[in-house]
């Protein structure tokens, strides 16, 4: 990079080029439809019930979200709006510590753990099973992850708008599960 010059970043999907030189989605020879019929960012609605319910319901939502993500990845395609709705219900592992301690967990926790790690006779949902980086990250996140409820996110958007933000590009401030993007006001 030349000193004093800012890099020019792509602004549209058409400007994005893979480093390997392989074709971009939508061009002849492309393998997936990364930008083809992409449904866009999922807009979270009140009726989605994001983060609602007891621990067991959140646990089931998390495992279903991971199962859905793995299917979409395996099929090398974009998620449908219905699949996006399922994945939007992922709340992280911060409040689900019982999952990592099989000695204090009930049947639903042990079943979910077996599904994630592949000890139920099926392929694991988490890469590498109980030795993989995803399981290690999950364990660590149970003490360090913090879920931001939709009501808090909506209130934060109200404050940002009050201070003059009227739309544009934003980054997911939590680097998390997408609630800030999913609850971004349309206007």
Feature roles, as predicted:
Residues 1-77:
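Charged, low-complexity intrinsically disordered regions
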């Amino acid at each position: 990079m030349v000193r004093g010059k800012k890099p020019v970043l792509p602004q549209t999907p058409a400007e994005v080029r893979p480093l390997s030189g392989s074709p971009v989605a939508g061009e002849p020879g492309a393998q997936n439809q990364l930008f083809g019929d992409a449904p866009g960012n999922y807009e979270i609605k009140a009726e989605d019930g994001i983060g609602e319910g007891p621990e067991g319901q959140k646990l089931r939502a998390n495992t279903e979200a991971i199962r859905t993500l793995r299917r979409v990845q395996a099929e090398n395609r974009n998620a449908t709006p219905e699949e996006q709705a399922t994945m939007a219900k992922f709340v992280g592992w911060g409040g689900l510590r019982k999952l990592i301690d099989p000695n204090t967990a009930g049947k639903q926790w042990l079943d979910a753990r077996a599904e994630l790690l592949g000890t139920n006779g099926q392929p694991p949902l988490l890469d590498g099973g109980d030795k993989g980086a995803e399981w290690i990250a999950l364990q660590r996140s149970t003490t360090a992850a913090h879920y931001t409820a939709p009501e808090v996110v909506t209130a934060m958007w109200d404050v940002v708008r009050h201070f003059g933000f009227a739309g544009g590009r934003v980054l997911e401030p939590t680097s998390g599960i997408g609630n800030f993007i999913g609850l971004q006001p349309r206007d």
